[in-house]
Amino acid sequence: MVHHWRKPKAGGKGLSLNDAVGLLKNSENDTVTLSIEREGEADLIETEVTKEKLAAIVADGKMLDDKIGYLAISEFTGLTSEQFQKAYQSLQDQGMERLIIDLRGNPGGLVTAVCDTLRQILPEGLIVYTEDTNGKREEYTCDGDTPISIPLVVLVNENTASAAEIFTGAVKDYGIGTIVGTTTFGKGIVQNTFQLSDGSVVKLTIAHYYTPLGNDIHKVGITPDVEVELPDDATSDVQLEKALEVVKGLESAE
């Protein structure tokens, strides 16, 4: 069946495509009626569609050639750890022997989310610790039940920030993987948003975080083990190509 676009109407008025999509998203009804135009047919088919909330995909994987798994994490939210676990397990079930985790463009997110994700691959020990302005220290640790034992590469760039740098820093400090790409953003602070009595909000830095070896990456970033730029005029993903080359040359810890 071929679907053709016909300018939709609401209340007898024509709508743009963007307006129609917005109407579907913002409708308070559980179901919406869609009219489908078929090629060569004058009559429209009307069907009711039940609206459901879809969970955003923030961690997804696929198998590349040579039994190399590829797992991209776009953000560390409340969904990340579970989605990572499912994607990681799926790749293992497919016979993965090497893994590339792509954190390029990942702006960070929740400290708890990145720690829950890292607990699936780190050995026993410290994941990250924070120190507030009074010097109070809070540690996040891993019991090391499921340390990764296959060759690992983590892809990063200048937009890899905050919680994504916690991930990168832990992998680097424990020596369980090789970092490939460009120097990360350099956001090593914890911030909270507070609402004032007049309704305005202010964002305050409440703590700094440090990698397992005590490195403060704020305004510095993490330098990759293998540096490779991705030029604006690149016709292929040279960073991923380098990651593939590197991961193929790594020895398994098994």
Please report, for each region that a protein language model flagged, where it lies by residue.
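Short, acidic, Ser/Thr-enriched surface-loop or helix-capping motifs
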Residues: 211
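Conserved functional hotspot residues or short segments at active or partner-binding sites
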Residues: 217, 239-254
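Short acidic, Pro/Gly- and aromatic-enriched capping/linker segments at domain boundaries
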Residues: 196-198, 203-207
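Cleft-lining beta-strand/loop regions that shape enzyme active-site pockets
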Residues: 1, 6-13, 18-187, 191-194
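Short, surface-exposed, low-complexity cationic segments
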Residues: 224-239
